[in-house]
């Protein structure tokens, strides 16, 4: 009987270890920006791949909330108060979502954290909705990428995938 229990425990341990070590199809990634004076922002997300698929308007439908990545919802952490696209965001941890459209995107900054991502049911926890700038990239981007480009005293948070770039300016308050 003890051998059976030891065998079952060993199998559970092995399966748990195998699952934990398995490579995720959409690996974790992050973007950071130093706003100066010890003020920083950090965005943590999972980076899905295009894999020959049509993304916007198909895999990611226009006009619907998208978690801006894969797996867990994308997090946005700021060490101090910032201004995102004209809206004040107090220091803290947030979840960000987007609503993509062909010519206009909306960034949603949400107080609810620790969520998987979709379906979106957190309207009551929204801090702000911000318009994003949208432009076309000259060549397709295979891996969904969030980056913070330093610009003057702030950063431009950009999301690139397929042939689309959505961006918004962030400054320290």
Explain the meaning of each model-derived region.
Residues 1-9:
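Bacterial N-terminal signal peptides that target proteins for export
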Residues 11-19:
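Hydrophobic h-region of N-terminal signal peptides that target proteins for export
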Residues 18-90, 95-173:
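Targeting-peptide/extracellular-domain and disordered-appendage signature
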């Amino acid at each position: 009987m003890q051998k059976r229990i030891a065998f079952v425990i060993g199998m559970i341990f092995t399966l748990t270890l195998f699952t934990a070590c398995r490579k995720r199809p959409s690996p974790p990634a992050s973007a950071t920006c130093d706003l100066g004076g010890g003020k920083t922002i950090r965005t943590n997300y999972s980076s899905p791949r295009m894999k020959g698929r049509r993304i916007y308007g198909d895999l990611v439908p226009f006009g619907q909330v998208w978690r801006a990545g894969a797996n867990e919802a994308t997090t946005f952490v700021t060490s101090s108060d910032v201004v995102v696209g004209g809206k004040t965001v107090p220091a803290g941890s947030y979840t960000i979502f987007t609503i993509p459209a062909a010519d206009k995107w909306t960034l949603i900054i949400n107080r609810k954290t620790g969520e998987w991502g979709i379906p979106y049911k957190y309207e009551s926890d929204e801090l702000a909705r911000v318009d994003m700038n949208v432009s076309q990239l000259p060549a397709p981007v295979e891996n969904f990428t969030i980056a913070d480009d330093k610009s003057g005293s702030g950063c431009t948070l950009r999301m690139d995938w397929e042939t689309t770039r959505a961006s918004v300016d962030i400054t320290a308050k």
